């Protein structure tokens, strides 16, 4: 017989048999080796075929092992040959293939030949219950009336079980999540499926709106007999395109597999509905030069109604791939799946609540569900409901479960800090100077304090963890019982159903109630101590997840933050002197937004700061960023003098398609995408090209901006500050006049420079006063304090006398240039002389650097601290 006429599976089995014989030092390959190889390969299908023929497969393997041990062994001879008995069986296999009209010899015919074999392999199968007629019937059933005409003839059998996932079976087992709502879409899908031709719906919607869930809902309705008569008993099979493509090395293999799937579907007489997720991947799948792709192979079956198909894809991909192929598009009927509103999302989350509680072993409260829907809708703008809301619930549950299973976050932070200090202690121990010794004492003291705190927390944690036991296992048992009850109800076995419903289920629910109350009592008994383990997901936990994901502080304000907001003016006045109106207006805007009273569709605040140079416009913006985020890093500063040309607008929002830099994104839009909660400073705004203001219109009004790539960037959580020197000559000339009078004059000047629609969208135009002599002294004190902080890092202290302070303020005061000359005065009169004295060794660690004004000059006299 010709070995090249064996199927790939049979060739593989013979090669495995040869390896098995060589490993066991058998000189000849016998039928029992081939039988062992066939049963050892899960992809061969031999085991399932024998089981279908009534053979007790579990009795075959031990008998094969025993027969292999009884074969003669030859040491040192690697030349393994085909035995006479195997040759005889292969000849009979060849004759059987010829009788059946097969071009290639398949492995199941080898099993058929073994039925008449007098050797060990035939005896083992007959003892396990093999009958030739039963095996022939099983082979005919598997082949489905087809001959083996190719080397891959065996591989493409039972293609549906290999390349699809049965969603109706998963629904029967209770493995699918419940589908809430979407009744109109499911009804429309059923309606299309009942058509005579072109009965193929395609679900089109944005990612995460629930397209796959609609198909799962259909599968659940079929299982529960909640569908029209024509759909009852049908199966919904999800096509696994990755499995179809994987391992198809040569041209034609993928097409053979897909053809086998289509053939089995045609033979099932419409009993199967195929679901193709990401339908656009079929258009072009397996495409090679001169070959058909999967989409073209599906067209005839779709048009004739042989293939019941449900597709799912996004709007963009449908337009890009499916609409281009008009012949494929006309075979599908569109079902548009929109994004559910917040109320519908809350209903969906309530339906999924029990599943997520069971998975994470925590309790999800109703306020958490409402918060997940509302906060995700407001703050996560680049994704869609209900997916983004489900993600919040899932992540909050995972976070609390992680705290229960591992160390609580507060203990973990303490542990890491202790390790860090221990490493630092070992490094400092090697040094002998005074500074290192002092640092070592500080480290030892802090370590002792942290270790005590850690030990206290550890005691509380162990006690709480001991209390939180048992509820998870009981909940899982209740879930299993409910799934079993649903299956019994479908089968009509009401006696067993009643036994579970009125016996086992109430008992489990009573146990769960007792375990919950014990857990609550454990948490309440130590009310004086902090509770480490949380077992509930509440609105606060959802807000924490949103805050971490977006950087936006949406969590409920703690008392400390409330007090901080009420004293906001005091904080800003520490850095900005003499601008009471500006500080008050900015503080009011921030308080409105944090209290939840501001318009949620606009930025927190948009201000135009006007005034002469050096009066604190930019400094107030820096102070605001420092107040909100404890860091000036969250200030996005854009110098508008860089945008003087018309084409420079593209730098703000990104270049349009076809231009260089399209992939890079815009300077402003990318910065806000990364830090959605920030202060945006547009410095010297009057120097920008007028077209730049057209871009800012939608930012100021709607809190959104579309970048060059078509993505919407959310500005609703930003504070926008624009600074300008316009009208500064009026402000200086009208010094001392009422604020409203000055503002009126400056407003007239603004109207000549900016368009009305731009000015109309700004929340407040803030006029900064020119600085006076008493303001300069306060600013000098702030500047000298910063210099003192820099000296403290070198273990020196700055001491400036009142006379020196007054002289610095006098020499640094210039009504035209504001506070900037003061900085230069401090540099020249204080910093330069002190720098020389430090380098000369006059001042060193633990010294006081005194600054005094005597006899018309600054004096620096060294004294020990």
From Swiss-Prot:
Signal peptide: none annotated. Residues 390-524 form a coiled coil. One of its GO terms (biological process) is protein refolding. One of its GO terms (cellular component) is cytoplasm. Residues 340-551 are annotated as: Linker. Residues 6-71 are annotated as: Repeat 1. One of its GO terms (molecular function) is ATP hydrolysis activity. Disulfide bonds: none annotated. The keyword Membrane does not apply. Its main location: cytoplasm. Homohexamer. The oligomerization is ATP-dependent. This is Chaperone protein ClpB. It comes from Bordetella pertussis (strain Tohama I / ATCC BAA-589 / NCTC 13251). The lineage of its organism: Bacteria, Pseudomonadati, Pseudomonadota, Betaproteobacteria, Burkholderiales.
